[in-house]
Structure formats: C-alpha cells, structure tokens
C-alpha cells in the first residue's frame, strides 16, 4: 500500500544520493534490489529468501563482473547481473526449496540465461 511506496521512495532517494556522492553504481540488496548510478534507477524483484545465505553476494558480484567484462556499461551490467542472479536463485528454489547454498544459485545460472536468452553463447576471452 501507501506505506510501502513511501518507504521505497525514501530508500531509492537515499541510495541515489549516495551514488551521486560516490560517483559509482550502487546495488542495495533487499526484497527489491535498488540499482542506481545516481541519475537513473531500477528495482529488481527477482530472488527469494533462500538466497540470504553466505556466498550469494559473491555470486552476484561475479555475475556483475562477467557482464562488465563483456563491455556493458556499469549500470546496465549491474542491472543484468542482479536479474540473472535473482532468476538463478528462483530456479534453484524451485528445485531445492528455500534451503539454498550459493553453489545451487551458481548451478542455475545457465538455466537463467536459457530461460530469457535461448541459444545465447557466452563471449569467450580473446
């Protein structure tokens, strides 16, 4: 309701201010991840409570790093990394329930790509 919208607006505003102040992209994890470069923002609602375990933030960082290495600009890379990691976590939860390990999320990353980008081939290092 209205309270949720008000709280989200405050949260987004605070994160955007911090991003501008630091001159960097920020991803604030939560039920809805907030991703911003200070000028624009996205909310990502993928993922589930089973992902609140050690190592999933490391997985998220690695996926974002992969998108950065593929020459995506930082805001887009962070949005894509958040989405893919969240979808992978949702797929893992369908298979295993909410008692997940970070490796369950990792194992589901190829399926997350296949679901939204069928036939996608990962860029290989040159």
Residue spans for each PLM region:
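Glycine-rich phosphate/pyrophosphate-binding beta-alpha loops
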Residues: 49-51
């Amino acid at each position: 309701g209205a309270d949720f919208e008000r709280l989200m607006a405050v949260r987004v505003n605070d994160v955007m201010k911090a991003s501008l102040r630091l001159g960097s992209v920020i991803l604030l994890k939560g039920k809805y991840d907030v991703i911003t470069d200070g000028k624009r923002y996205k909310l990502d609602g993928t993922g589930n409570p089973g992902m609140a375990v050690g190592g999933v933030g490391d997985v998220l960082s690695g996926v974002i790093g992969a998108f950065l290495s593929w020459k995506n600009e930082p805001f887009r890379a962070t949005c894509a990394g958040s989405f893919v990691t969240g979808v992978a976590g949702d797929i893992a939860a369908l298979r295993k329930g909410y008692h997940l390990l970070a490796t369950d999320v990792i194992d589901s990353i190829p399926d997350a790509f296949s679901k939204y980008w069928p036939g996608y081939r990962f860029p290989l290092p040159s």
